[in-house]
């Protein structure tokens, strides 16, 4: 998956994946060393210590700079105009810092399990899927879109710094915020990259099952041992996914809540800035705020999309297996293998039920989007007299 392939799109995907890997190492959020001889990852206590030091230093700097700004009375005009917005922003700042600490600590705490999961995926890639040169468009598309979203998200603090007329934040503050944001985005991305890699493997299994159906319809013989082997691979993927979801359950819920809350606050910020202060420039009104909101929702929607994609691909496996029912005079061993595969798929599915609270798919993503709009309306109605 990290091998450069021919074609501009594949090379672009390779560059993005490498950039994610090295950025994660530099920020200390990927505490694994690669052993070329064994072709596996090994957890490093030095990298864990390095990650704790880097993450703690950035968070302490960010909190310290925020406290110094309050001591010196540095406050945006919009906060002076609307006390509710200032209180909500302060509360979100505290919640954000606590959430980021929780995300980092839980990820490091589960790093031993993550080592097992990543090595399992790498082993499957090297032994069973390495020789398959078929490109997966959905995999490439997700990596490219996610890379663009992260780059645009990193530009947002700098756009605020240079685009806001009353911005008084030092460049060092903006740099620290950007680094903290990059680390948080990459931590969330590690989970979704694992999901999309599992999707790619399931997609390849479905492709081979379809090829077997076409071969049997052409009066060619099929191998029951190959079907049992595909079932074995499918079982490994389901187990790896279950472990991956268990490791990232809490982090994913926190990240989704933070991004949805951030979008609500940014929209309310734009309303207050435009109505109360009446000095929003063309750049701020049509570029900066809409771009920040669109980027956050795009990031949120990509997370929903990749989870929904894996679930649909898992359901497609069951649908493909049903196609074997139309084939007459099928070998008895092959028929038993297909039945076992279908029975397994009906009992073991790819389900995204984070912390037992809600399922993650496009329908739930749309409901969350509608809920965000309603919360924004409630907020405007509550503080209508101060606008």
Curated annotation (Swiss-Prot):
Membrane topology, from the record: Multi-pass membrane protein
Transmembrane domains' residue ranges: 44-64, 83-103, 143-163, 185-205, 253-273, 282-302, 364-384
UniProt topological domain (Extracellular) ranges: 65-82, 164-184, 274-281, 385-387
GO molecular function ontology, one term from the record: taste receptor activity
Domain of life of the source: Eukaryota
InterPro entries for the chain: 7TM_chemorcpt (IPR013604)
Cellular localization per UniProt: Cell membrane
GO (cellular component) term, any one: axon
Cytoplasmic side: 1-43, 104-142, 206-252, 303-363
Single Gene Ontology BP annotation: monoatomic ion transmembrane transport
Keyword list, A-Z: Cell membrane, Membrane, Receptor, Transducer, Transmembrane, Transmembrane helix
Tissue expression pattern: Expressed in neurons of the dorsal pharyngeal sense organs of larvae.
Disulfide pattern: none
Entry keyword annotation includes Methyltransferase: no
Membership in a protein family: Belongs to the insect chemoreceptor superfamily. Gustatory receptor (GR) family. Gr22e subfamily.
Its job: Probable gustatory receptor which mediates acceptance or avoidance behavior, depending on its substrates.
PANTHER family named in the record: GUSTATORY AND ODORANT RECEPTOR 63A-RELATED (PTHR21143:SF131), INVERTEBRATE GUSTATORY RECEPTOR (PTHR21143)
Name the UniProt record assigns to this protein: Putative gustatory receptor 22d
Biological source species: Drosophila melanogaster (Fruit fly)
